[in-house]
């Protein structure tokens, strides 16, 4: 792996008011101290590295800047005041930007996009977030996103994003990626690398009106209380590549309808004597299988068979009657 370029990308000058403050909602608070999320995208590109650097890279960088005008939380920082009575928030200043790394790799592109491979093959493609800094009164300033573009000459390239979940969920991130891709395509087709904003926007713009999220049950206050006493520095310095990933294979498994039915039948047979007949949904049996496989793959040594293991799944709430809006960055 050879790093070709390290730079910072920000929204166009004066395109976002400075400072801009975004309060966190009760949806966001639980993610404040969670490990960063990584998402990687692969693209075929059968050309040498120099061709990529001269043609595609300038378009990607210019279009990213334009995209960040509308998705500015990704170039912002998470602010955690030392005073536990002051809530964390997202802050954008006109000096803020995100880390953008360009690298070249001799890795086999076809292997990287194959279905079954060593999980460590992707690790060199993943950027780390820049280290947090400290402002006056010991306020912690934590970068929200870092991007790495890795070129595999004459075969393809990858774009990997490491980001704090507090700024966006999966739907918001994919909105960001689709928007960036659309602007890039627009710029390439028009052969125009200027930052002129006259071209029409390719997709719907995100909403950052977090004050529209209602919290009648006071969940935000409860979540904030749970954060008190948490040592953020331990997590901030944690290695994104865990030891549990050593000697592991990454593979996508697709369950057919017939296999799901067999699972349901097998579980029903096991449970009929002790629990009687129960309805088993596809979600329940699939989640149970995933849960079991995750625990086995982590090879955690348990002293007791009945040690508690949690399985957490996320749910979309944008279309509920109370929260019919676009959350976070999109």
Predicted feature residues:
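Long, contiguous juxta-domain segments that are non-catalytic but functionally important
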Residues: 1-26
């Amino acid at each position: 792996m050879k790093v070709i370029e390290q730079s910072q990308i920000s929204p166009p000058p004066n395109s976002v008011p400075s400072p801009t403050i975004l309060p966190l909602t009760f949806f966001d608070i639980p993610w404040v101290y969670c490990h960063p999320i990584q998402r990687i995208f692969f693209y075929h590109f059968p050309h040498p590295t120099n061709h990529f650097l001269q043609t595609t890279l300038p378009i990607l960088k210019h279009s990213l800047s334009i995209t960040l005008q509308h998705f500015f939380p990704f170039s912002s920082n998470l602010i955690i005041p030392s005073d536990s009575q002051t809530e964390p928030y997202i802050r954008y200043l006109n000096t803020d930007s995100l880390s953008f790394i360009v690298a070249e790799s001799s890795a086999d592109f076809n292997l990287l996009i194959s279905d079954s491979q060593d999980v460590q093959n992707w690790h060199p493609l993943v950027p780390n977030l820049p280290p947090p800094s400290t402002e006056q009164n010991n306020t912690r300033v934590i970068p929200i996103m870092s991007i790495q573009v890795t070129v595999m000459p004459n075969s393809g390239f990858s774009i990997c994003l490491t980001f704090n979940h507090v700024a966006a969920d999966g739907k918001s991130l994919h909105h960001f990626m689709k928007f960036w891709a659309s602007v890039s395509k627009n710029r390439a087709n028009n052969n125009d690398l200027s930052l002129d904003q006259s071209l029409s926007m390719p997709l719907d713009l995100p909403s950052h009106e977090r004050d529209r999220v209602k919290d009648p049950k006071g969940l935000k206050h409860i979540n904030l209380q749970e954060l008190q006493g948490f040592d953020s520095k331990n997590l901030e310095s944690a290695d994104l590549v865990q030891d549990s990933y050593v000697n592991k294979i990454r593979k996508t498994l697709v369950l057919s309808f017939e296999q799901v039915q067999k699972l349901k039948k097998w579980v029903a047979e096991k449970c009929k004597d002790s629990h009687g007949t129960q309805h088993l949904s596809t979600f329940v049996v699939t989640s149970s299988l995933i849960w079991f496989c995750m625990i086995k793959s982590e090879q955690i040594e348990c002293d007791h068979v009945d040690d508690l293991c949690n399985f957490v799944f996320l749910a979309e709430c944008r279309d509920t009657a109370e929260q019919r809006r676009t959350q976070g960055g999109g």
